[in-house]
UniProtKB/Swiss-Prot annotation:
Keywords: Chaperone, Cytoplasm
Sample GO molecular function, one term: ATP-dependent protein folding chaperone
Any GO CC annotation of this UniProt entry: cytoplasm
Family of the protein in this entry: Belongs to the chaperonin (HSP60) family.
Cellular localization per UniProt: Cytoplasm
Function: Plays an essential role in the productive folding of MimA and MimC, and thus in the formation of the active MimABCD complex.
Name of the gene this protein is made from: mimG
Name the record gives this protein: Chaperonin-like protein MimG
């Protein structure tokens, strides 16, 4: 297919148009008085949100050159969201400012490669300055303020997240779920919980609550599919002789084997429940092994060399109580040996350190939390589906910000830490066009503060000038319009979020300002193509390579 090309300042100008289009749509959401964006959906009601990455994902531009610029800034938001789950709007604003300042310098004759080098040498100095001024989270009030600020100053969200995090601690897991009821609530899981429930309603022991509750059960763990009576009979005999109910956690149980277990429940001759094993694919055996350690049992699998027909009492795990619903299972009081559980947790923590993908780390975090019994679920409800989705996005942002603060500490918020970080650059000696790169970063650092002030109805440049001369940590409160100590007023940001936003923005901006040629696919209207007023050729609907998200 033929290509369309643009060169030099023309290429950079078209790319900058896309950068500005996306950033202008996102930056109006910045700060406690930021506005919302409404996003059309092909199916269902539109989405109303102030989440930067959610807005960025929806933006595709008609001009293919401008669209490439927009996709590059979208990458900034996506990368920041992937690293810390928050700070996407700040990253987008920083990227726009660096691109604007950098392209002005290049068009004025600066060497783009030296400018890029200057940016790359400046950012680590700023990050180190931020790190040196960060402090550890000292109280639940700090957690509450961090969560509330990340959720557009919603104190209700701050209270809920602080309560959840306080219970599970730094190493625990907090998850979010949609709820059918209004408002928000925290459910604390004491023990081990996973998402699969019973496979048959005939196994329910409490019809009113539709729960199967078994006290002091024996538990069979296997990744096999059980269909024949002969496969389950040895385990049933062990449970019957012990006069204890049986729980089968397996890949699947069906056919005559399931009929036998259901019949025992209906005739009350043998109480049992079948639960589908947690995890999928290769992770299933690993998660079953976690349960085996916690329950003091063994996994019946081909890899372990134990067959279903060879099961004895020593192979079965146990706990004080197991509760299964249609959707999830909770194990309370597992009978595993604590030293073995601690060793398994240490093994999983070592795996997490080596994990490269965020998804793998999240899964390992959940497995560790299950074994340590520290899991909290925040249930979020809303009057309409639109309100529910908007609130869920804010809760997820706030939760990510809280986790980041616990991991790496906090800095003064409201854009203050970045705006005052320029002081660290006074001692950075660069020459020539590298010094221009340093000044590009210096001017961009104040941009988040400027837009927080503008969105709150104040003159952004005046606020930036005042904050630049204030003592370190003193800044502008956009809610009250007053200046003061950010830490005392509870206006704080996680250091990890601020760092990720700056590094992601600088990475893309440094690459974009070195662009000399832009190449896109040429879209040619086909003879006889359907045309519609205001829409044009149907070929315009083709997905471009730059529309990767």
């Amino acid at each position: 297919m033929a290509k369309e090309l643009r060169f030099n300042s023309d290429a950079r100008a078209r790319l900058e148009q896309g950068v500005n289009a996306l950033a202008d749509a996102v930056k109006v959401t910045l700060g406690p008085k930021g506005r919302n964006a409404i996003l059309e959906k092909l199916t269902g009601p539109p989405t109303i949100t102030n989440d930067g990455v959610t807005i960025a994902r929806e933006i595709q531009l008609r001009d293919p050159f401008a669209n490439m610029g927009a996709q590059l800034v979208k990458e900034v938001a996506m990368k920041t969201n992937g690293v810390v789950g928050d700070g996407t709007t700040t990253a987008t604003v920083l990227a726009q400012a660096m691109v604007r300042e950098g392209l002005e310098a290049v068009d004025a004759g600066a060497n783009p490669m030296r400018v890029r080098r200057g940016i790359e040498r400046t950012v680590p100095v700023v990050v180190e300055s931020l790190r040196s001024h960060s402090v550890e989270v000292g109280s639940s009030a700090d957690l509450r303020r961090i969560a509330a600020l990340a959720a557009s100053d919603d104190e209700a969200i701050g209270d809920v997240i602080a309560a959840a995090v306080e219970h599970v601690g730094k190493s625990g897991v907090v998850t979010t779920e949609e709820s059918d009821t209004l408002g928000m609530a925290v459910d604390v899981v004491d023990g081990i919980e996973f998402d699969h429930g019973y496979t048959s309603g005939y196994m329910v022991t409490d019809p009113e609550r539709m729960e199967a509750v078994l006290d002091n059960p024996l538990i069979l763990l296997t990744n096999k599919k059980i269909s024949q009576v002969q496969e389950i009979m040895p385990t049933l005999e062990v449970a019957k002789r012990a006069d204890r109910p049986l729980v089968v956690i397996a890949e699947d149980v069906d056919g005559p084997a399931l009929q036998l277990l259901v019949g025992g429940n209906m005739h009350k001759t043998m109480r049992s429940v079948v639960v589908r094993a947690p995890g999928f694919g290769h992770r299933r055996v690993a998660e079953l092994e976690d349960l085996a350690v916690a329950l003091n049992g063994h996994v019946i699998a081909k890899d372990t060399g134990i067959e279903l027909g060879e099961v004895t009492r020593e192979h079965l795990g146990s706990c004080d109580r197991l509760t299964a619903t249609e959707n999830d299972t909770t194990i309370v009081g597992p009978h595993g040996l604590q030293n073995l559980v601690d060793a398994r947790v240490a093994q999983l923590e070592a795996q997490r350190e080596r994990a490269r993908l965020d998804a793998d780390r999240d899964i390992l975090d959940l497995r560790i939390a299950r074994l340590t019994g520290r899991v909290a679920v925040i249930r979020v409800g809303g009057a309409t589906s639109v309100e529910l989705k908007e609130r869920m996005l804010r809760v997820e942002d706030a939760l990510a910000a809280t986790r980041a603060a616990l991991e790496a500490g906090i800095v003064s918020g409201g854009g203050t830490a970045l705006a005052q970080a320029h002081r660290a650059l006074d001692t950075l000696e660069l020459v020539g066009d590298e010094a221009i790169g340093r000044d590009v970063v210096r001017r961009a650092l104040a941009e988040p503060l400027r837009w927080i002030a503008i969105n709150a109805g104040f003159e952004g440049d005046d606020v930036v000038d005042v904050v630049a001369d204030l003592p370190l940590g003193h800044g502008f409160n956009a809610l009250t319009g007053e200046y003061g100590d950010m830490f005392e007023e509870g206006i704080i940001d996680p250091f990890k979020v601020t760092r990720a936003a700056l590094e992601s923005a600088a990475s893309i901006a440094a690459l974009l300002i070195t662009t000399e040629t832009a190449v896109v696919e040429e879209i040619v209207g086909q003879p006889g193509a359907i045309m519609a007023p205001g829409f044009g050729d149907l070929a315009e609907g083709m997905v471009r390579p730059s529309n990767i998200y």
